[in-house]
């Protein structure tokens, strides 16, 4: 359900940013609150023609790639490098705020050569990870797939072991 919500949010945000507006001033980018250390951090290397990784599933990746292809196609690999770095940061569990701040800084710096990408797409992507990144961050943790059995799920009777024991017992043919 959360993935559908994220996908819907991305779709609505992209559709809204694609329609002409009469306002002349864009909202200030989210990156204005970043620490000087993050703003000066080394940018990740650009991997040419890598698989697009901005999004949580194939649908959101398709929407986000379409956004970049429409507004700043020459920056595709640069923006994707920010997403790859962000994914790695989440997997390393380096702290969600740190990962998101680094991602937003990367987007802001990588998109400077395109006004529409810098003023619209980068802040949109930044806001999306800040708004919906909790689940992805938690799922990226090393123990994300482990669960504990509830008392109702624990069963004293082990059917598989019982059947295996029956199959291992030699049958009497007399």
UniProtKB/Swiss-Prot annotation:
One GO cellular component assignment for this chain's record is: extracellular region
The processes (GO biological process) annotated in the record are: arachidonate secretion; phospholipid metabolic process
**Annotated InterPro entries:** PLA2-like (IPR053322), PLipase_A2_dom_sf (IPR036444), PLipase_A2_His_AS (IPR033113)
Superkingdom of this protein's organism: Eukaryota
Which Gene Ontology molecular-function terms are recorded?
phospholipase A2 activity
Membrane-spanning residues where?
A: none
Q: What is its main location?
A: secreted
Any keyword Disulfide bond? Answer: no
Q: Which family does the record claim for this protein?
A: Belongs to the phospholipase A2 family.
Region feature (Disordered): 137-174
Q: Where is the signal peptide?
A: 1-18
Record-given protein name: Phospholipase A2-like protein Y52B11A.8
| Sugar-modified residues | 49, 143
Which UniProt keyword terms apply here?
A: Glycoprotein, Secreted, Signal
